[in-house]
Amino acid sequence: MAPISHTRISLSMYNSWIRYFCRTGETNEAMSLLAEIHSLGSRPDPLSYVSFIETLASLRRTLEADALFHEVVRFMIYGSYSVRLYNALVSRYLRKEVSWRVVNEMKKRKFRLNSFVYGKIIRIYRDNGMWKKALGIVEEIREIGLPMDVEIYNSVIDTFGKYGELDEELQVLEKLQRSSDSRPNIRTWNSLIRWHCHHGAVDMALELFTMIFEDIGELVGKLKSQGVAPSANLFCTLANAYAQQGLCKQTVKVLKMMENEGIEPNLIMLNVLINAFGTAGKHMEALSIYHHIKETVWIHPDVVTYSTLMKAFTRAKKYEMVCSFYLVTL
């Protein structure tokens, strides 16, 4: 881009260029314009500050974002963007003490905390081992009459799941399903299934799977209508859960659903399928997946592939094949 001539540029033009550079990620150019505005004894407008802080925060340049934030607070440059300004800061800070400082500043200035901020607070508590305090936030939300949206429910579900409180996690799911304001979304199911698998409650994970996939066509249709498609991560988690139980048909079904969504099975997924067949005692089917991997140009067997095959053929007492796979790994 050609350099900007700064002679006789109006303040509104400065603001327009700052916002443009923020949108395009050219923060150094925006910083130069900010410095020039300051040298002229003026300041950007509220929207320019918000755009600047959002951009810096998204790039994890939190010290610079914090400095601009304090400038905004000091000179009361809020406009109509005060909540958006605070949300940008809260969403990007990784350290709980800094996030809390921003939240407390919001409370001090009588800004109404929204569900986004409360969800962030719950996650701060969760990530620092204070899950009971995280649940106390839910009571605060109820007391002020803020509707419990799906993001708050998801934060609570993820908190219970992380600390193995699976019964409580399911109770929150029931409340969400009964809610007139919110419904479970793909993040809800991802979290429920992932934590149940993580804590060894595979049967319940499979039950949750059937709850969302009773009518796969209807589910996918709903997700797409909301602009959300089932993720590769969800399919992988479900396939692995079935594979651990040796449920081959279900594992294959999940992989086919994934292919129907245009997600190509990768080596991890195919290793999962080998494991499913091996656990079910179908070593020849496991071998056919191995041959498929070998024939695929962009995928190559790894140590997991061979170790899984060795387990499958050990179960089948085909020890000569176990030796042959072992030799390949040397």
Curated annotation (Swiss-Prot):
Xref: InterPro entries: Pentatricopeptide_rpt (IPR002885), PPR/CCM1_RNA-binding (IPR051222), TPR-like_helical_dom_sf (IPR011990)
Keyword Mitochondrion: no
The keyword Repeat belongs to this UniProt entry's keyword annotation: yes
Pfam family, one: PPR
Organism encoding this protein: Arabidopsis thaliana
Renumbered ranges of PPR repeats: 10-44, 45-75, 83-113, 114-148, 149-179, 185-215, 231-265, 266-296, 302-330
Protein known as: Putative pentatricopeptide repeat-containing protein At5g36300
Domain of life: Eukaryota
Keyword terms, alphabetized: Repeat
Family, similarity comment: Belongs to the PPR family. P subfamily.
Position of the signal peptide: none
